[in-house]
Amino acid sequence: MKKKIEMDGEAKGSCEEYEALSRRGFLGVTASAAGALSMAPSFVLGSEPSRSGNNGRDVLVVVYLRGGMDGLTAVVPYGDQALYSARPTLAVPPPGQTDGAIDLDGFFGLSPALAPLMAPYNAGELAFVQATGSPDPSLSHFEAQYFMESATPNMGHTGINTGWIGRHLSTVSPLGAGLFRGVGWSPMLALGLVGANGVLSIKSPSDFVFPGEPATEALRRQLYLEMYSQTIEPLKGAAASSLPTVDLLASVNFANYSPANGASYPASSFGEQLGYTAATIKADIGLEVAHIDIPSWDTHANMGPLTGTLATKLADLGAGLEAFWRDLGSDIDKVTVVVMSEFGRRVEENDSEGTDHGQGGCMFVMGGNVDGGQVISQWPGLDPVSLGNGNLPITIDYRDILAEILEDRLESPSAADVFLGYQPTYQNVTF
């Protein structure tokens, strides 16, 4: 068995704010939202079976890169010479040079660490979006993650404690019984998922079991239901649905899952969680959304875009996504993957061989119904006049991308409701 590579530690050279959030395990859930969730047993966030859904919807897989991923290293604007003036030691070289970017379209290139992603890109099932992000100007991890996941940038602290994914799920009928609509492969529920029933937050499927000896399981289940039948909602309803959800997950048989089509997931937490997601999708038990967090993208010092910290993290990201795409095969036609981060990095490198908090970044969108093989961008330029404050401007709001996916692929009746009145401008990222 391969030894699992631990990729979950704090980023070397990350800022004090990010390290504090990492130590607390902050994943975007505000105190009041977390308090509401804690009213249910820690392993129960299910709902009673409800209406049947439309099985034509895509499964949404959200990969959140916490800490602020450097989009200028991932998708390199090598055609903009100002990049090399701003980053004389950190910029990925142009295509054709040693350790150079892999050409995508004559202007943008892919980090060599992400080379596996050329397969879905060339197949027309992966697109990149550059100079995108949230218009929240704070550049604080805490603020940026909150506003991005609640989809409330520039609205201030309104007390909204639901996330854009949770609000989406609350506006559409469940697929199947609605017991297991969404999962966050994490000990804590990401704010983006808050606001819908049938959503679990578990680090591993092995964490969601009914413990004890098989010989006494029937009796223990009976006593468990009797105990919670005397309580109030939401405990009563959560307990009633928890056991069917345990049985539903047990039917997937994660322990014996074998990837298809020669796919090989990286031996990391990310690779493991992608494997769980693929197994659940193939089991067709009603999953609508999976959320995966990858921490430690805050690269203030010793960034290492070619051989160091960032290159290692990008390699894990690229290998995992390619394996997931390959493993799903034709099932990728009913899946859309979105990769996002709270902000990008400042254009100019700092004196610690790293980059500081910036604004515009990049997103990845992958799936069988993605208009891939392209970089979607309204490129503003990296010269000092175009930058203004030294950060890459946001020319495509991240909600434009998400709203298009929700309406085109997930049958959202109104993205404006999910995004609280925001009127998106579609970028033709999906068919």
Task: Label each region the model flagged.
Residues 358:
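Conserved active-site-proximal phosphate/metal-binding subdomains
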Residues 321, 325-352:
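Metal-dependent active-site segment of extracytoplasmic phospho-/sulfohydrolases and closely related
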Residues 353-354, 396:
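Short Gly/Pro-enriched turn/cap motifs at secondary-structure boundaries
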